[in-house]
Amino acid sequence: MSSEVNSEEILNKLFFSQYKALGLIGEGSFGKCFKGINIKNNEEICFKIEKKSSQKTFLKIESQALENLKGGKGIPDFYLFGYSDNFNILIMELLDKTIENVFEKNNHNFSIKTTCILAIQLVRIKFILYLFYS
């Protein structure tokens, strides 16, 4: 997700009358990912955002994939994909930890069990990418 998205424009702003971004989780080549909240029920959510001007709307593709995979093991719940101001926005379940969090917590070391769990999850991800991008 890309640095084109200015975090200051996003933080504490209300989107779709109920979702507010509270803090940056991370960013990639297409946009940014925020921890947020649904102010109607106080549920913490994940808030992904990219500039509407992006050549491809990766978040729309991701939302379609999440909708198609709904209920699958390890698949976060998908709440909403929409447009607001100059942004494409994906609202989904906030998952507990990132791989980076676990790695740092374990002094930059993974056990054999954790490595095997990650390998299985990576195979799942590869399969999902194969289904949607080939």
Protein language model features and the residues they cover:
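Conserved N-lobe ATP-binding subsite of Hanks-type protein kinase domains
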Residues: K32
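Short beta-strand micro-motifs within the conserved protein kinase catalytic domain, predominantly
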Residues: D77-N88, D96
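Protein kinase catalytic-loop region centered on the HRD/HxD motif
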Residues: R124-S134
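Structural motif in protein kinase domains
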Residues: L95-K105
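Juxta-kinase regulatory segment immediately upstream of eukaryotic protein kinase catalytic domains
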Residues: M1-F16, L22-G23
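The N-lobe alphaC helix and its flanking beta3-alphaC-beta4 segment of protein kinase-like domains
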Residues: E43, I49-P76
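Conserved N-lobe loop of protein kinases adjacent to the ATP-binding glycine-rich P-loop
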Residues: E27, I37-I45
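Activation segment signature within eukaryotic-like protein kinase domains
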Residues: L118-A119
